[in-house]
From Swiss-Prot:
The gene is potB. It is found in: Cell membrane. It is a multi-pass membrane protein. Its main location: membrane. This is Spermidine/putrescine transport system permease protein PotB homolog. It comes from the Bacteria. GO terms for cellular component: plasma membrane. The chain crosses the membrane at residues 10-30, 62-82, 94-114, 136-156, 193-213, 248-268. It comes from Mycoplasma pneumoniae (strain ATCC 29342 / M129 / Subtype 1) (Mycoplasmoides pneumoniae).
Length: 286
């Protein structure tokens, strides 16, 4: 009976997952594999697999998202650690509220504010005050992603450091570790789960972002994955083939992402499991 009550508490979550994730993904997969208007699956996927634009867009989004994650992690990790060591709870709450403030406001308002600030700074530097189209290049897209998605790295890390037992640090110092060694050998391993959570919260939105590149990069070369799929989706209103190609682009990007996730997360576990089995087998035979 107790077990059934636990399952009942999970019902709303699974219902929402089915409605907002499983059903849309199923529709995307079916749409991507259907023959639209007499076009075969080969004709639908050939511009994606054989074309340069898709993989160029995916590569651009991949390196941009990777740099965003690295910068966010380098900024958030020491900041959250030293903030969690403060004994003043009011100060900690105030600072973390300021650090995560961009999450509270509208996405569009944040983009407008950042674009205005960048145009003002560039206008003063180039003596072109009043010109609202001075942000050219993917560097401004990267600045926007770092600004918008870094707060998502703060929350899991800060919560993790707040529950970090101080006894671990004291024990490492008793063993002769200095604070740098304790940080590397104690704090970072303890924060592994929080780091992975922060990376997921930062990486995937950066990888699939649409509006940031369109809004901040005026070079008309904002060929990110999100913009590529968005363009195909817009053309899909008039062309079923383009709509199918958009679905195909999402499927290919998802497969590449899941393959990368498998290599990073599950492959090391499988290797360790195989090594453990081999060691046990050798011990039994010896």
């Amino acid at each position: 009976m107790k077990l059934s009550k636990k399952y009942l508490l999970a019902v709303p979550f699974f219902v929402l997952m089915v409605i907002f994730f499983v059903v849309p993904m199923a529709w995307i997969i079916v749409s991507g594999l259907q023959n639209e208007n007499g076009a075969s699956i080969t004709e639908k996927y050939q511009p994606l697999v054989g074309g340069y634009s898709f993989f160029q867009s995916f590569w651009t989004s991949l390196w941009t998202a990777t740099v965003t994650v690295l910068v966010a992690l380098l900024v958030a990790f020491p900041f959250c650690y030293f903030l969690s060591q403060s004994k003043n709870k009011v100060f900690r709450s105030f600072v973390i509220a300021l650090a995560t403030a961009p999450i509270w406001s509208s996405f569009l308002i944040k983009l407008i504010g950042l674009k205005t600030l960048l145009d003002l700074v560039l206008g003063l530097a180039l003596n072109r005050v009043g010109d609202n189209n001075l942000t050219f290049g993917s560097g401004y897209t990267l600045i926007g992603m770092i600004y918008l998605f870094t707060p998502f790295m703060f929350l899991p890390l800060y919560n993790n450091f707040c529950i970090l037992p101080k006894n671990l640090i004291l024990a490492s110092q008793d063993l002769g570790y200095n604070w740098i060694t304790s940080f590397i050998k104690v704090v970072i391993p303890f924060s592994k789960t929080a780091i992975l959570s922060g990376i997921a919260l930062t990486f995937f939105p950066s990888l699939t972002s649409v509006a940031i590149a369109q809004f901040l990069d005026n070079s008309n070369q904002n060929n990110t994955l999100g913009n590529y799929v968005f363009t195909l989706g817009n053309n899909g209103y008039d062309s079923a083939i383009e709509r199918g190609r958009a679905s195909g682009a999402i499927i290919i990007a998802a497969l590449i992402t899941f393959a990368f996730y498998f290599v990073v997360i599950f492959a090391p576990r499988i290797v360790r499991l195989i090594q453990t089995k081999c060691l046990k087998y050798r011990r039994v035979n010896v």
